[in-house]
Design a protein with these regions (language model features):
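Long, hydrophobic alpha-helical segments that serve as membrane-spanning/inserting helices
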Residues: 1-34, 41, 49, 150-151, ...
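Pore- and pathway-forming membrane helices of multi-pass small-molecule/ion transporters and channels
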Residues: 9-18, 33-74, 84-89, 106-173, ...
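Membrane-entry segments of alpha-helical transmembrane domains in multi-pass membrane proteins
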Residues: 26-31, 46-52, 74-82, 97-104, ...
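A cross-kingdom feature marking solvent-exposed beta-strand/loop segments within repeated
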Residues: 42, 74-78, 96-101, 147-150, ...
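Alpha-helical transmembrane segments of multi-pass membrane proteins
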Residues: 61-62, 354-366, 376-387, 402-414, ...
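Juxtamembrane/interface segments at transmembrane-helix termini
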Residues: 125-129, 175-188, 447-451, 477, ...
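C-terminal functional regions that serve as terminal interaction/effector modules
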Residues: 418-419, 423-430, 434-438, 446-474, ...
Length: 683
């Protein structure tokens, strides 16, 4: 700790970030890492044995293709086959008509690149068009390097082998030989979430970060999509399993903030908690066996009173409704999402995005051709790879690409100077490459915030030491050229994306926050009674809220990187947005607490109060886009009915009013000390 205390704060934060990313425990990460690691070693062995060129491209196919489960890997493999046909076909057409005419070649390749970048943003299968764009721009370097059309044709045909044999390899490893099924991952994930819930139910533990809770909830939803596509039994009983996922998510997220020491430990409460933990354990065993859980537990009056006293009645009711649900309930037909974005042909940002990418590539190509520097062809690839919809995400990708390239170049330099002179055969080479590929695979299977570093590190290392050589290489120029090409592409892209039609999310962020608060107002309008349809709707909207708050959090991080904005305005926007996100999460959990009390108080006043809260929240959300939102001030009248039957309900709703009052005032020029103090009071 003393060493960390002496380091600058940004360095400590960076080390904490890498520690979190490298130590992340995600279901399927270890099998995915092993598959990727073994696949890389096999690619090196096959490419060196049969002298197949472009080994870095083969490694890139593996890193993009091997996914966390067998179904996803198979789906991406099919996309890669389609992409290979499209990209090689487009290259041959370009060469056929314009091989000896660079200007005409660019005139033909330009619209192809623009079309691919446009479809990458607007089409569901954007990955296919991204691959076509990469090869279309990379293929323009072949005629510049070689004066013989026959050799260029052979290299282009080799690209088919280079793209398809790693695809076959990853299909054999990840789908046929050592598959990691989504259904098994789902069962394990549900059990892990229930384990965490039981721990917080029985012991006083510190709550996990809300961002982690939201990521786990989103991971369950993604696994549910894969299970629906990959498992017939899951599809047959999909209504029950989807309800199970929603229930587990609710129990996990709600009990995360639960503290059993906050309530009196009467004998009735202790016995009820034990009974509830026992039912959750039964659900775990059923899920582990892939069976739909059925419960015969019927809560009696004393148990209901104990549940209400310790704020567990709503969790108990959601669990019981799942246990009494018919496994053969027909699923609700899901609406098929459109293949294209709804505003694909009306929003000018998509076409501007394609034009900006083309402009960056043309600038790099002009420089690359003008200086006749063959080794920096990676500058054009960089322009396509770092092209993202907005300035913040583009900067994120630039940092990841530069960081990965820097690490890969350093490893390549050390490898060439210290290791390469001592190698005599392919076996020794594989033993030396194994730890490098293992590190790259582990980083590449982390979260989206850092995974690209692993991919870029391995690809840069391979470009500098293994590309088109089948024996020892001692040329340090390759390392320099590849790294400089990436730096040039990054600088050009940064300038273009910052000053040419910059897509800032500063205006989108308040709208995103308004959408999240709008969903929260819908939650408040749902009747707080034990009715099956209302409760299921409540659970589904809660999952949507997790996704909405997580998306707002990520957007805040991207807006923080938009240096073209005024620093004070950017800091104020981020501070207000983070306060809204934090208060929104607290409001959701506070509203959960009111359900336990409101269910026992069945009178006409409760919908009126809920509507009052929802109206105030909707009014606040409506003013976010124009920065006219003020902190809602709500006053509740004490009613004899609520005070006589459940005095805790009024206290819970008054706490909701206090959270409303702590929402930031967007009309003020800056955050006031009182607001900051109110924020701290909620921690």
């Amino acid at each position: 700790m003393s060493a960390l205390n002496s380091l600058p704060l940004p360095v400590v934060r960076l080390l904490a970030f890498f520690h979190e990313e490298l130590s992340e425990r995600r279901l399927g990460r270890v099998p995915q890492t092993v598959q990727l690691w073994v696949g890389c070693l096999l690619v090196i062995l096959i490419s060196m044995t049969f002298e197949i060129p472009f080994v870095a491209l083969s490694l890139a196919v593996l890193f993009y293709g091997i996914q966390s489960n067998a179904f996803y890997t198979k789906f991406v493999a099919i996309l890669f086959v389609v992409a290979t046909v499209l990209e090689i076909g487009s290259l041959f057409l370009i060469y056929k008509w314009s091989y000896s005419e660079p200007l005409i070649r660019l005139v033909i390749a330009g619209p192809i690149l623009m079309g691919c970048m446009f479809l990458m943003r607007t089409h569901r299968l954007g990955l296919v068009f991204f691959a076509v764009a990469i090869v279309a721009i990379y293929g323009q370097t072949f005629p510049a390097m070689l004066d013989y059309p026959e050799v260029v044709v052979r290299l282009t045909l080799w690209c088919i082998v280079v793209g398809l044999y790693p695809t076959l390899l990853m299909t054999l490893i990840g789908v046929l030989w050592f598959p990691s099924r989504a259904i098994s991952q789902m069962h394990q994930a549900l059990n892990d979430r229930l384990d965490d819930a039981i721990s917080h139910l029985t012991d006083s533990l510190a709550p996990l970060p809300e961002t982690r809770i939201e990521r786990e909830a989103l991971a369950l939803q993604k696994l549910n999509v894969f299970c629906l596509a990959d498992d017939a039994n899951w599809r047959t009983q999909s209504a029950w399993w989807q309800s199970c996922v929603a229930t587990v998510t609710y129990i996990y997220s709600t009990l995360n903030r639960y503290d059993p020491t906050s309530f009196a430990d009467s004998q009735a409460i202790i016995e009820f908690r034990q009974k509830l933990a026992s039912e959750i354990n039964k659900l775990q065993h059923a899920v582990a066996e892939g069976q739909c859980w059925q419960s015969d537990w019927r809560i009696n009056e004393s148990e209901a009173m104990a549940a209400r006293e310790c704020n567990l009645e709503n969790i108990c009711q959601t669990l019981l409704q799942l246990g009494q649900m018919d496994p053969n309930t027909p699923p609700t037909p899901a609406a098929k999402p459109p293949s294209m974005a709804a505003d694909a042909f009306t929003n000018p940002d998509y076409m501007r995005y394609a034009v900006k990418t083309l402009l960056a590539c043309l600038i790099c190509y002009t420089f690359y051709s003008g200086v006749d520097w063959e080794g920096i062809h990676t500058c054009m690839l960089t322009c396509v790879i770092v092209a993202n919809p907005n300035v913040g995400s583009s900067y994120q990708k630039m940092v990841l690409r530069f960081g990965g390239a820097f690490c890969g170049a350093i490893l390549a330099l050390l490898f060439t100077l210290l290791v390469m002179p001592w190698l005599d055969n392919i076996v020794e080479l594989l033993f030396v490459l194994a730890p490098i590929f293992l590190l790259g695979a582990w980083i590449a299977t982390s979260s989206e915030r850092s995974s690209y570093i692993g991919t870029q590190m391995v690809v840069t290392f391979a470009l500098a030491t293994l590309e088109n050589v089948y024996g020892p290489v001692y040329d340090l120029v390759e390392i320099r050229d590849r790294a400089l090409g990436i730096i040039i592409g990054t600088v050009v892209s940064a300038v273009i994306y910052t000053f040419v039609w910059p897509e800032s999310e500063a205006r989108t962020l308040p709208q995103k926050l308004a959408g999240a608060l709008g969903m929260l107002s819908k939650v408040m309008r749902i009747p707080r009674q034990q009715e099956v349809t209302a409760l299921r709707t409540y659970l589904q909207i809660r999952i949507g809220l997790h996704a909405a708050f997580n998306a707002c959090e990520e957007m805040c991080q991207r807006v923080a990187l938009e240096r073209q904005l005024d620093s004070e305005e950017r800091a104020l926007l981020i501070a207000r947005s983070q306060t809204v996100i934090r208060q929104g999460r607290d409001l959701l959990h506070a509203w959960d607490a009111t359900w336990n009390s409101a269910q026992a108080l069945d009178n006409a006043l409760q919908p009126d109060r809920a509507g009052q809260f929802a109206d105030a929240l909707e009014k606040y959300a409506a003013g976010l886009a124009t920065a006219l939102s003020r902190s809602p001030q709500i006053t509740l009248e004490e009613t004899p009915a609520s005070q006589a039957i459940l005095p805790t309900l009024l206290k819970q709703e008054q706490h909701v009013c206090q959270l409303f009052a702590r929402l930031p005032d967007w009309t003020a020029p800056a955050l006031t000390p009182a607001t900051e103090q109110a924020q701290g009071a909620t921690q």
